[in-house]
Amino acid sequence: MKVLLFVLSLFFVTLSFAQDSTKVKLKEWVGVLTVTEKFADEKNWTAAEQSIVGEHFQRLIKMKEKGIVVLAGRMELPVSDPNMQGLVIFYAKDEKEANEFMMNDPAVKNKIMNAKVVPYGIAVSACK
């Protein structure tokens, strides 16, 4: 009986490791967002653009809750400042998926923001 329990426990341990090895390891990426030239001038913002940026923010929150987004934020600079950028650190399996993630952002799709995707590696983090 002890042998049977031992063999069964080995089977289940092996099975659990086998399942982990089939998972695709996600890579870290950073999406760099910049405001398009038209919207660098705050006079060009309407309620429609404000609403789209609200959708952009809600999407980031939803993706954070799903474990895709690690963190997202923007520099505390005026929209008109050429150095102003937003950053999104997130997980994707490959460059294609990373680009799709950023290009499907409502602010990017509606040409309010431009997005660039770069491979990234988190070295130190307090994020959980």
Place the predicted regions along the sequence by residue.
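Conserved, structured core segments of small domains
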Residues: 19-128
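Bacterial Sec-dependent N-terminal signal peptides
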Residues: 1-22
